[in-house]
Regions:
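Solvent-exposed alpha-helical segments within well-ordered globular domains of core cellular machineries
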Residues: 9-13, 27-31, 42, 46, ...
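Cys/His-rich Zn2+-binding cysteine-cluster or related metal-binding knuckle/ribbon modules and their
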Residues: 2-9, 17, 30-84, 89-93
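Glycine-rich nucleotide phosphate-binding loop and flanking beta-alpha elements
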Residues: 93, 149, 170
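Single conserved hydrophobic/aromatic residue that forms the stacking wall/gate
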Residues: 161-173
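Acidic, metal-coordinating catalytic cores used for nucleic-acid/nucleotide bond scission
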Residues: 145-155
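Extended interfacial segments that mediate partner engagement and assembly in macromolecular machines
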Residues: 26, 76-145
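Conserved functional loop/turn residues at catalytic and ligand-binding sites
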Residues: 19, 137, 167
Length: 173
């Protein structure tokens, strides 16, 4: 038995595909969007399409950036180029930047090693990190993955593969 018109049900299903959004929350979001004036709904859908079309990964650090070239952090002459802070997700870069305490570069892995979720080292941006450090000039690699089991496993793996010697490896607490 169908409770909603097909287009509304499809919208609910799309919202329910988002992480952390269950069916009831998806219904609330769908009804909210349905109640928006047409121009605001169009702005919302256009913002999604613009983000998909214009946001890419930085070819240097793998963070998100607009366009195809290096991001603002990698391009900045004010950053310490000999230090790389390794984080799991782009949102972690934002968190680090908000502290105002770190002035080096980043490398975003886009996940952590998680055997339960079938995510191994080859699924992450580890190869890019190894290549980047091998180019030289990096004195310090700071592991800033979360202190949970998966974050610790990822940091341990990175320390065991000896990214590059004599680079100093640190773990934040």
């Amino acid at each position: 038995m169908e409770y909603f018109p097909a287009p509304l049900e499809k919208l609910v299903e799309q919202f329910a595909r988002l992480p952390g959004v269950g069916y009831k929350s998806a219904q609330r979001l769908a009804f909210y969007v349905l109640g928006l004036p047409r121009d605001q709904a169009a702005e919302f859908s256009q913002a999604i399409l613009d983000a998909k079309d214009r946001v890419h990964t930085c070819p240097v650090c793998q963070n998100l950036t607009e366009g195809d070239g290096p991001c603002a952090i990698c391009s900045s002459y004010k950053r310490e180029k000999d230090t790389i802070c390794v984080v799991a997700e782009p949102k972690d870069v934002i968190a680090m930047e908000r502290t105002g305490e770190y002035n080096g570069l980043y490398h975003v892995l886009h996940g952590v090693i998680s055997p339960m979720n079938r995510v191994g080292p080859d699924d992450l941006r580890i190869k890019e990190l190894v290549e980047r450090v091998a180019q030289g000039g990096v004195q310090e690699v700071i592991m800033a993955t979360n202190p949970d089991t998966e974050g610790e496993a990822t940091a341990m793996y990175l320390s065991l593969i000896h990214i590059s010697e004599p680079t100093r490896h640190l773990r934040i607490s």
